[in-house]
């Protein structure tokens, strides 16, 4: 059941999104291999780094909404020099990553408070995976932390970007037009904040409850 909810099970022509979904008897099912990262979030960021040709090697990085550390793990495995990992929660972050000297973990910390802790203009690359809030709410703090020409690569979750009335039962956005409008709102916010958008792509795996998610990348141009 967990594999289905994680978007890891598919038939030859479609991905299964519900454990109760019916398929024809005898049909072949394919299960995606397990992640090499501490969480499946690493696979999402891996896709974004490849799609937008972003190389973290030697860079000072920021992970907003680090949770268990999938994004942080991906950055480190790609050669990041350091990662400031931030989350409002606590006791979720991987024990293995906690021991890594390249990681500075800020738990129980809102991103808006981070510039006062670490200073301004200190990161080359920021990545983000936040829930129950819009990516646009973290933009001002991220911009303050980014160096000139720094890159911001974020996961965009339409279920937290779209108006409440456009989110379907169970918190799932099934309407493609609603998903695209949500993505466009974040894209527009990027441009208004001073980020030149390099592109967007769909996440290789779905989010919670099968929600389609996107990756959006921008480079600071002012």
Protein language model annotation of sequence segments:
Residues 1-25, 60:
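A basic, amphipathic helix-loop patch mediating RNA/tRNA/ribosome contacts
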Residues 57-67:
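Conserved class I S-adenosyl-L-methionine
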Residues 74-82:
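Conserved S-adenosyl-L-methionine
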Residues 84-133, 137:
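S-adenosyl-L-methionine
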Residues 136-153:
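A short glycine-rich, Lys/Arg-flanked "PGG" loop and its adjoining helix->strand segment in the class I
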Residues 158-175:
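Short, glycine-/aromatic-enriched active-site segment of Class I SAM-dependent methyltransferases
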Residues 205-222:
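Core SAM-dependent methyltransferase catalytic element
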């Amino acid at each position: 059941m967990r594999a289905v909810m994680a978007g890891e099970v598919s038939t030859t022509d479609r991905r299964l999104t519900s454990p109760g979904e019916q398929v024809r008897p005898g049909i072949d099912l394919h299960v995606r291999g397990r992640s090499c990262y501490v969480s499946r979030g690493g696979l999402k960021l891996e896709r974004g780094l490849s799609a937008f040709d972003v190389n973290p090697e030697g860079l000072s990085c920021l992970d907003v909404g680090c949770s268990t550390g999938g994004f942080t793990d991906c950055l480190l495995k790609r050669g990041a020099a350091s990662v400031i990992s931030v989350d409002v929660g606590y006791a979720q972050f991987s024990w293995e990553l906690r021991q890594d000297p390249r990681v500075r973990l800020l738990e129980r910390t809102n991103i808006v408070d981070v510039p006062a802790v670490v200073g301004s203009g200190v990161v080359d690359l920021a990545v983000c995976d936040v829930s129950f809030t819009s990516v646009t709410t973290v933009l001002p703090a991220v911009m303050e932390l980014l160096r000139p020409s720094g890159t911001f690569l974020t996961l965009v979750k339409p279920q937290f970007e779209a108006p409440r009335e456009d989110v379907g039962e169970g918190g799932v956005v099934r309407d493609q037009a609603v998903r695209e409008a949500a993505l466009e709102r974040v894209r527009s916010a990027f441009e208004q904040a001073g980020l030149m958008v390099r592109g967007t792509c769909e996440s290789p795996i779905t989010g919670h409850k099968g929600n389609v998610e996107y990756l959006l990348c921008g480079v600071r141009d002012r």
